[in-house]
Regions:
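Short, hydrophobic beta-strand segments that form beta-sheet elements in well-ordered domains
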Residues: 1, 148-149, 191
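ATP-dependent helicase/translocase motor core
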Residues: 1-118, 127, 131-143, 164-168, ...
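Hydrophobic positions in the central parallel beta-sheet of the AAA+
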Residues: 121, 169-171, 191
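Conserved helicase motor
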Residues: 126, 147-157, 172-178
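Phosphate- and divalent-cation-binding pockets in alpha/beta enzyme and binding domains
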Residues: 131, 178-179
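Conserved motor-coupling elements within RecA-like helicase/translocase cores
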Residues: 151-169, 182-186
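Short, intrinsically disordered, charge-balanced linker/junction segments flanking boundaries
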Residues: 178, 188-191
Length: 191
């Protein structure tokens, strides 16, 4: 939680390193060593605090420990993937754990880590596409760009062809068929 959050938005920092988690309850040293290492604290302040919402409904968000460590690990996997087979892996969180915001933090960090790639967020449901697009749109200042929703396969292709870097584009998998040619040959697209 942040200073403007209700008590229900506060959570414990339960890991020092992202590997082991004290599930019973958080210890002070776990919180202190997990969050207040100099480099990590500066990273959290720079990359893991954002504002979401609009107008009077705007609020500050601070990543939880599980989001911080998962996003940092995903960024490292993405860097490796660009030098190897191109496969970054799967990002998994339980329901209600802040997956959408983890994705926002990830997209934000990718811009620096991979030299301004285009991020394509592909979902299997229209309602999920709309939900994620709305969440990312509310965080456009943090992302330093305005997300776009592709309305068709042709629109997606033109969005990819019309840029050499940057962009966060939302689409559904229903716009594709098996055996199709790639929509782009660019190497700096993260799906």
């Amino acid at each position: 939680g942040t200073i403007t959050s209700g008590l229900d938005r506060f959570m414990e920092w339960k890991s020092k390193d992202g590997q082991s988690v004290d599930e019973a309850f958080a210890q002070f040293d776990t919180f202190y060593e997990g969050m207040f290492q100099k480099e990590r604290l500066l990273d959290i302040l720079k990359n893991f605090i954002l504002f979401s919402g609009t107008g009077a409904g705007r609020f500050k968000v601070l990543a939880g420990y599980h989001q911080y460590f998962a996003v940092r690990k995903a960024i490292e996997k993405a860097k490796i993937a660009t030098r190897t087979d191109g496969k970054g892996g799967v990002f998994w969180h339980t329901q209600g754990s802040g997956k959408s915001l983890s994705m926002v933090f990830y997209a934000h960090l990718l811009q620096e880590a991979l030299e301004s790639p285009t991020v394509v967020v592909m979902t299997d449901r229209i309602d999920l596409d709309d939900q994620l697009y709305a969440q990312f749109s509310q965080c456009a200042d943090f992302l330093r760009q305005t997300p776009i929703q592709a309305e068709s396969k042709e629109h997606l292709k033109s969005l990819l062809d019309g840029r050499t870097a940057n962009g966060i584009i939302f689409t559904t998998m229903f716009k594709f068929e098996r055996g199709e040619k790639p929509l782009s040959e660019r190497r700096n697209i993260v799906v």
